[in-house]
Amino acid sequence: MKTDQKLNMTMLCDFYELTMGNGYLKAGFQDRITYFDVYFRSVPDGGGYAIAAGLDQLIDYIEDLHFDQQDIDYLRGRGIFCEEFLDYLANFHFSGDIYAVPEGTPVFPKEPMVVVRAPAIEAQLLETFALLTVNHQSLIATKANRIVRAAKGRAVMEFGSRRAQGSAAAIDGARAAYIAGCCGTACTISDQLYGTPALGTMAHAWVQMFDTEYDAFATYCKYYPQNAVLLVDTYNTLKSGIPNAIKAFNDILKPLGIKKCGIRLDSGDIAYLSRKARKMLDEAGWTECTITVSNSLDEYLIQDLWMQDAKIDAFGVGERLITAKSEPVFGCVYKLVAVEDKDGNIVPKIKISENVGKITTPHFKKLYRFYGRDTGKAIADYLTVYDETVDDSRNLEIFDPDATWKRKEVYHFEARELLVPIYQKGKLVYKRPGIEEIKKYCTEQVDTLWDEVKRFDNPHNYYVDLSQKLYDIKTELLNEKNERYEKN
């Protein structure tokens, strides 16, 4: 990067957003109000649900959305943008509306996570960053939540910064992991920026720096008696590491009356070593000593450890969490669903594809979630046209939009709107929750899902249904487009 060049994140956009914006202005569309939905088509890892995340960083981006003179000069140098468009960018500010599901909300395919209502150029320029931040953080939050659930109440620490795909991925990934249930992160700057608790004790290098393993452990216990978690696999876990840890605990912590301490296993047969370690620690009287394990873990390996009767109190999970290694793409898209005509009427738009899963759901919409009043559990999600309301005092028949003969009557339920206002006329109206509040909300909302939806393999298919009015509009647009092309 040029040393005199400042980084303006507004320029983190796909070039076609600028060429389209230039074209919109030339065509007279710059003031035309458009509606875009951000949604995904399938849950990573074949899961039953995803976790929404990344909204806070999208807000940060919009709050600083502007084009510097160096940006205008660069674009002018490309030689394809008219001066009127460059003037437009030089005076750019966001003036639209945004709605979104709160971070930490369980979400499902084909329902809008973010809705943008704004003039055409403004809405188009948001596309790349909206997708970047929602895709990345939702991906990591979804993976982290799977791992946390596999841990069955034991602590999960995010350890992946060094394996993340770039610094931003490490920082924001740690945030997303914390929202989804991790107890903390090894990423110090994420704690500094977001308040995700920074955790960590020692690496093998600490042990290697001392003449003996015991000296390394004893010194660490002296310096950090309230946080003595010793890495015991540098040389020989059972014959050296654990015995030396026990000796250090006896010599340093016991005289201080400290009973809480820990060891960490980072290699070898984790299940076997954890069982042996637990036995050795208990026999030595250190029953409150915790056993933390790491080493390329994910939800499936953690499940396997439980099947092998592993004795584990906490997990440090790195590369397979921070990169979502098993399926590292979330797949959110940003699609035009409506425009306003010159009289302010909302005109629904649809994109058709040979791939049925890529056909969009048109119109400016509301998203409801139905909860059973007796159980508190989520029953289904329900998309309506923006001007519809749901009367949850009456029974309602819902149907699968892809198989309309599959119908169900919902009764004794509560309907809650999921999309909340974030921006109104360019002004931030959303009260941004703190990270602890988001984390708590995420836990509460995941608890509203039935266990069948939370299965790792072959989860129950949670339905996102359409109102009859919305379904009819979509069908009418499909038929209209098909008839037009058949005539040609």
Task: Identify the meaning behind each predicted range.
Residues 60-64, 100-103, 107:
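An N-terminal, globular interaction/scaffold subdomain
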Residues 98-104, 413-418:
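Short acidic, Pro/Gly- and aromatic-enriched capping/linker segments at domain boundaries
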Residues 204, 294, 318:
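Residue-level "edge-of-site" marker
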Residues 2-32, 36, 45-47, 282-284, ...:
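Gly/Ser/Thr/Ala-enriched C-terminal appendages of enzymes
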